[in-house]
């Protein structure tokens, strides 16, 4: 079920504070965050976030296409090694 329109999008307060200060100072340094649940807002366009995926931080550059998604959607947490295929024997 989607979030109610009257509530608005969720962004952690500490993350929004860092975004606003980076915008006012024209700072291009990446913002390190563990907040995968925060929604990407138009104020975040052009900022690079280092999003934690459980092991390390994945750099994510926010563009217009990212608005409305969650930060965690751009930092995958699982690595897919592939299904076991059939072994080809030498003839």
From Swiss-Prot:
GO MF term set: rRNA binding; structural constituent of ribosome
InterPro entries in the cross-refs: Ribosomal_uS19 (IPR002222), Ribosomal_uS19_bac-type (IPR005732), Ribosomal_uS19_CS (IPR020934), Ribosomal_uS19_SF (IPR023575)
rRNA-binding in keyword set: yes
GO BP annotations listed: ribosomal small subunit assembly; translation
Pfam families: Ribosomal_S19
Gene3D superfamilies: 30s Ribosomal Protein S19, Chain A
Family: Belongs to the universal ribosomal protein uS19 family.
The protein's name: Small ribosomal subunit protein uS19
Species in which this protein is naturally found: Aliarcobacter butzleri (strain RM4018)
């Amino acid at each position: 079920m989607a979030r109610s329109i009257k509530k608005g999008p969720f962004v952690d307060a500490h993350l929004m504070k860092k975004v606003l200060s980076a915008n006012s100072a024209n700072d291009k340094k990446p913002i390190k965050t563990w907040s995968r649940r925060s929604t990407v807002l138009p104020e975040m366009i052009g900022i690079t976030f280092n999003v934690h995926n459980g092991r390390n931080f994945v750099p994510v550059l926010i563009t217009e296409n990212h608005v409305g998604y969650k930060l965690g959607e751009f930092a995958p947490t699982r690595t897919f090694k592939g299904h076991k295929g059939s072994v080809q024997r030498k003839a």
